[in-house]
């Protein structure tokens, strides 16, 4: 009679067989998250729209505001619908936001003092307003819905997943240097993007930092000398920025965290700084920005890179 434990596997012990026990090998995996700076063209638009909404709600808490923004070389375009008893100076608000971000020089191709501002914001349709303006709070509607997903985690004190928290913090430190300690990296301009890749164990514990990618806009602070090509000058600029990132920026990033996270940086991680070689033309001058394309960066989540976004640099 066949043994039950083997017949359950579809194997008869009456036959000559070899059975190999297979042990599942542990397998680590890589997890990547991305952040963009306040000077990224899409985030410029988000911040302008935020400021318009905030100003109107401050003036009239019952305001209903839909505001979309497009920013490109030398130009900001606003469109949307508003129902409010408040007033906001669109022109002044836009220039204040752009100035605060750091676009304050004509050499950037987009600056607070000279950019054109076109506003096509108009009254909200009364037909739409009927659906979103109710006297009873429990009957209050919403014009649009957005769906995001994510999770809280104990990886960081603020419950953010570690990869996205590191990506955010790297750019916050970069912005602090640019605005408050410019002598350290005097060539910095506002636009930047970061990516952090972490190796995790198969039971989802961070093992080490695998890769740090930072693209940061900069002045053209090295020009070709005699018998030197433009490529040589570009290479020298990129190397200077990489050296500063390694010696100044990353130590500041690491210092923000406790010893357990600091230990993840002790391995031989890969560092890519301005991997295209040069990033002088940036911000809305180099890449048109639109509201709503960086919602994922604002959400409290980290997502594995599962596909590529078509068109532009994303």
Name every feature range the model reports, one short phrase each.
Residues 25-66:
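N-terminal, positively charged regions that mediate nucleic acid binding
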Residues 32, 92, 99-282:
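Glycine-rich, mobile lid/loop segments that gate access to catalytic sites or pores
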Residues 66-84:
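Short, charge-patterned binding micro-sites
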Residues 2, 12-14:
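Cysteine-centered motifs
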Residues 250, 290-314:
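Conserved mixed alpha/beta catalytic, RNA-binding, or beta-rich assembly cores of soluble enzyme
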Residues 81-88, 276-295:
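Short glycine/threonine-rich loop-to-helix capping motif typified by GTGT followed
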